[in-house]
Structures are given as structure tokens and as C-alpha cells.
Amino acid sequence: MNIFRLTGDLSHLAAIVILLLKIWKTRSCAGISGKSQLLFALVFTTRYLDLFTSFISLYNTSMKVIYLACSYATVYLIYLKFKATYDGNHDTFRVEFLVVPVGGLSFLVNHDFSPLEILWTFSIYLESVAILPQLFMISKTGEAETITTHYLFFLGLYRALYLVNWIWRFYFEGFFDLIAVVAGVVQTILYCDFFYLYITKVLKGKKLSLPA
């Protein structure tokens, strides 16, 4: 494992922990898109079905379990424990416009036409767009809490670091996964505008807002 994948994983984990702590400490999920969190839970569920069929390393298995547990915990907090604070009026992105095309694409473009491989491909495609309901929600409300922007920053940083990881692996290991790379590029592009606003506003103590 190279340093870029490790730091990418740590950034991803940091984003998840920040979100969970934000919800738990404030006893509120205001400003958080439950739909994005449902999509991420679906991403991890379909990606890590091989948890029961293959073992790569203790680190790999541990991270899979952590991602699954945290994603389910987040969904539980939003839709059950702190349901009264969930802003469903602004979380209105039509997720079927993401899930259906992604599902079709995973059947058409994959590495191998087997159930686990198709589901893995589905998870890669879906992860690249799963943040859209959250960004859409921010654009509707006009701004985001600082802690929410920190969550989004680390989530975007994780994907950017993984792009560097793939470049590293291509040059030093000869490994290249076109599906993962293209999906990662799409996901990183979605974060570009947010990164700019994060650096120019949030780091200077200002509120972040996305254009409606």
C-alpha cells in the first residue's frame, strides 16, 4: 500500500467520523442530506459483499467493516434517532435519476458479467455521484454549516488522493482500472467548485454557499 491510498483512506475515515460526531454532539442532522447517506450506505453494501467470500488483509477487512458500520449508523441517526431534525423539505433530489442510470451502466460496462462484479461496478459508479443530493441541498438552503463543509472537504480530499494513488500504481505497479479512474475523475470534478469555495471562504471564517 502506498502513502496516497493510506492518506486517502484516513481522509475518508475522517469525513465519516466528523459527520457522525456532528450529528451526535448537536443531536441534530439539520443540513445533512439523508438521501446522500442512503446512497453511500448502498455503495458500501454492494461493494463489500466480498467480505464473506475473500480475505486480502486485516487492514482491508477492518476498513470494510468500519465503512459499513458507520454508514448504517449515520442512516439510523438521520432517519430514526434524530428524525425530527431531518430537513426533508430541502432534501428533495430525485435519487432515482442516479440509481437507475448507474444500474444500467453497471450491466453494460464492467470487467466481468458476474453478480459480485456487477455490484462492485455499480458501487463505483454510484459513489461518483452520491454526493449530488448533499450539494443540491446546500444550493437550496443557500449555505452550509462549517462542520458540514469540513466533512465534504475530507470526502473530496479522499477521492483526489485516490486519483494520485491510481497514477502511482500505474507507474510503479503497472496497474490500471479504467472504470475506477473515470468514476474517480467524475467525482473529483463534482468537488472542484466546492474546493474553491472552501479555500476562499471557509478557511477564512466565512459561511459557504453554493449558487442555486
From Swiss-Prot:
Segments of this protein annotated with the region Interaction with the K-D-E-L motif on target proteins: 47-48, 159-169
Main localization, broad class: endoplasmic reticulum
A GO cellular component annotation in the UniProt record: transport vesicle
Recorded consequence of changing residue 133 to L: In OI21; uncertain significance
Entry's Gene Ontology BP terms: maintenance of protein localization in endoplasmic reticulum; protein retention in ER lumen; protein transport; retrograde vesicle-mediated transport, Golgi to endoplasmic reticulum
Cytoplasmic side: 25-32, 80-92, 136-149, 200-212
Organism superkingdom: Eukaryota
Recorded coiled-coil stretches: none
Membrane topology term: Multi-pass membrane protein
Site (Interaction with the K-D-E-L motif on target proteins) residue list: 5, 54, 117
Membrane-crossing segments per the record: 5-24, 33-52, 59-79, 93-110, 117-135, 150-168, 179-199
Subcellular location: Endoplasmic reticulum membrane; Golgi apparatus membrane; Cytoplasmic vesicle, COPI-coated vesicle membrane
Alphabetically ordered keywords of this record: Cytoplasmic vesicle, Disease variant, Endoplasmic reticulum, ER-Golgi transport, Golgi apparatus, Membrane, Osteogenesis imperfecta, Protein transport, Receptor, Transmembrane, Transmembrane helix, Transport
GO molecular function, one term: ER retention sequence binding
PROSITE patterns for the chain: ER_LUMEN_RECEPTOR_1, ER_LUMEN_RECEPTOR_2
Region (Important for recycling of cargo proteins with the sequence motif K-D-E-L from the Golgi to the endoplasmic reticulum): 204-207
Function of the molecule: Membrane receptor that binds the K-D-E-L sequence motif in the C-terminal part of endoplasmic reticulum resident proteins and maintains their localization in that compartment by participating to their vesicle-mediated recycling back from the Golgi. Binding is pH dependent, and is optimal at pH 5-5.4.
Domain remark in the UniProt entry: Binds the C-terminal sequence motif K-D-E-L in a hydrophilic cavity between the transmembrane domains. This triggers a conformation change that exposes a Lys-rich patch on the cytosolic surface of the protein. This patch mediates recycling from the Golgi to the endoplasmic reticulum, probably via COPI vesicles.
Disease note: Osteogenesis imperfecta 21: An autosomal recessive form of osteogenesis imperfecta, a disorder of bone formation characterized by low bone mass, bone fragility and susceptibility to fractures after minimal trauma. Disease severity ranges from very mild forms without fractures to intrauterine fractures and perinatal lethality. Extraskeletal manifestations, which affect a variable number of patients, are dentinogenesis imperfecta, hearing loss, and blue sclerae. OI21 is a progressively deforming form characterized by multiple fractures appearing at birth or early childhood.
Similarity remark: Belongs to the ERD2 family.
Name under which the protein is recorded: ER lumen protein-retaining receptor 2
Organism per entry: Homo sapiens
Gene coding for it: KDELR2
